[in-house]
Swiss-Prot record:
HAMAP family: dGTPase_type2. It comes from Haemophilus influenzae (strain PittEE). This is Deoxyguanosinetriphosphate triphosphohydrolase-like protein. SMART domains: HDc (SM00471). GO terms for molecular function: dGTPase activity.
Length: 461
């Protein structure tokens, strides 16, 4: 966005509409329950079965069986801690400097105006606790398997499943999931578009679905990002108080699809979501690297290219510290590695700043958190290293491929005789669902499994 697109005269007074604390179903506090709305949301997520299940979902599949490595549960706890630190950092005057130059408004005035917009600790922790609960067993392999099986019924994607769990599946209410506040749900939605629109248009492609599940190519069935069409009612409710301009702008894609194999990604997210996503990226780039180093998945020789790339970034802190950081990352002394990890996390957190997204009417959409340009590049180096040497590690890929096979075969088995093989409650839901939604019931059941549970069920079958 050009600096002259939004001028000081365009700045609208900061108003946080009370509708953001509304819930889909009336839900008055219990007697003598004086907790604010977002603390109640935090409690519901923390005590949910979907959150507990994260303890049995591995963050990195190639690092072996020991007590050190992170699960998706410990990852989510670390994301919450980083998220709270980012919120605290965004209250300081220096984080408004770039936005002040963009809008030609005094940064003290911006600080006074925008600080009340920041999420509370309860809210940001709610988002960070919830952000991974829709991810299926066996990582990308599991996601691909379910997307392959659901390609003709709207597809499957982990973020979409998170929204579905929060708004429908988690049995806090009969049909509205956890019945969370509107602002909490807005903060969880990373991609505000329908998945079947954002995903590759499989009907126009020549990908065969009549093949042995052992030979499904993962790259042919990587899903897009969005919300299931089955959950459109709750998505519409979430956005119903936005202006028509905001709803249209919020769902815009970054580009126009040029061929049917392309996935589309939306351009915008809420302020709260941008903070949560930064926290997730920092945890992924730094803490997952720590796991890989400790367990021997990566070595100093492999790190050299990343080290050289970081040396080229015009950051005074990196120029001064990256040699020492790299040495301590691979030190035999655990405390030195922990100090290096802590220094990196602090570097990313303290370089967060406010940014203007677009001329939204809603302040929660008008502003986001971001890292400064050189720090974005640095985080990208860390994320790429984890992707290249950890996620794409052959051991990781073999485990995910095995999971992909298991989930695809389980889906086919359940679909062949669901009333016999599905658990009673799931079978009842399948029986009562309209024909076009029966496969979604099977998908929900499999997606909710942990890695170990999926393996046990597969062995039983």
């Amino acid at each position: 966005m050009q600096k002259n697109e939004i001028k000081q005269s365009d700045m609208k007074p900061l108003i946080i509409d009370s509708s953001w604390t509304e819930r889909f179903l009336p839900d008055p506090p219990r007697e003598k329950d004086n907790r604010p709305p977002f603390r109640r949301d935090r409690g519901r997520i923390l005590h949910s079965a979907a959150f507990r299940c994260l303890q049995a979902k591995t963050q990195i599949h190639a690092i072996g069986e020991n007590d050190f490595y992170r699960t998706r549960l410990t990852h989510s706890l670390e994301v919450a801690q980083i998220g709270s630190s980012l919120v605290a950092q965004l209250k300081f005057l220096e984080t408004f400097e770039s936005l002040s130059q963009t809008l030609n408004i005094d940064k003290n005035e911006l600080q006074k105006q925008l600080k009340p917009l920041l999420p509370s600790n309860d809210l940001i922790e709610s988002l960070c606790f919830a952000h991974d609960i829709g991810h299926p067993p066996f990582g990308h392999g599991g996601e691909t398997a379910l997307n392959y099986m659901m390609a003709e019924q709207g597809g499957f994607e982990g973020n979409a499943q998170t929204f579905r769990i929060l708004t429908k599946l988690e049995p806090y209410t009969e049909n509205a999931g956890m019945n969370l506040t509107r602002r909490t749900l807005l903060g969880v939605v990373k991609y505000p578009a329908l998945l079947d629109v954002a995903s590759p248009q499989y009907a126009e492609l020549n990908f065969s679905r009549n093949i042995d599940p052992r030979f499904v190519r993962i790259h042919d069935w990587i899903p897009g990002k969005g919300i299931f069409r089955d959950d459109l009612k709750m998505f519409n409710w979430l956005l119903e108080n936005l202006s028509e301009n905001d709803r249209t702008l919020f769902g815009k894609f970054k580009k126009v699809r040029e061929n049917p194999a392309e996935s589309l990604h939306t351009r915008f997210k809420s302020l709260d979501c941008s903070i949560m996503e930064l926290a997730d990226d920092i945890a992924y780039g730094v803490h997952d690297l720590e796991d890989a180093i400790v367990t021997g998945v990566v070595n100093p020789h492999q790190w050299q290219a990343a080290h050289s790339a970081l040396k080229q970034i015009p950051s005074a802190w990196l120029q001064e510290n990256i040699d020492s950081i790299s040495q301590r990352l691979f030190s035999d002394k655990h405390f030195e590695r922990k100090q290096a990890i802590g220094a990196l996390v602090n570097f990313f957190i303290t370089n967060v700043r406010w940014k203007l997204t677009a001329n939204f009417d809603e302040p929660l959409l008008r502003y986001n958190a971001e890292l400064s340009p050189e720090v974005i590049v640095a985080l990208g180096v860390f994320k790429k290293f984890v992707w290249d040497y950890v996620i794409r590690n052959v051991d990781t890929q073999r485990i995910e491929y095995k999971g992909q096979r298991m989930l695809t075969e389980m889906f086919q088995i359940f679909e062949s005789d669901p009333e016999r093989l599905l658990p009673r409650n799931t079978a009842n839901r399948w029986r009562n669902a309209p024909e076009e939604r029966k496969k979604r019931i099977i998908c929900d059941y499999i997606a909710g499994m942990s890695d170990a549970h999926a393996l046990r069920v597969y062995q039983q079958l």
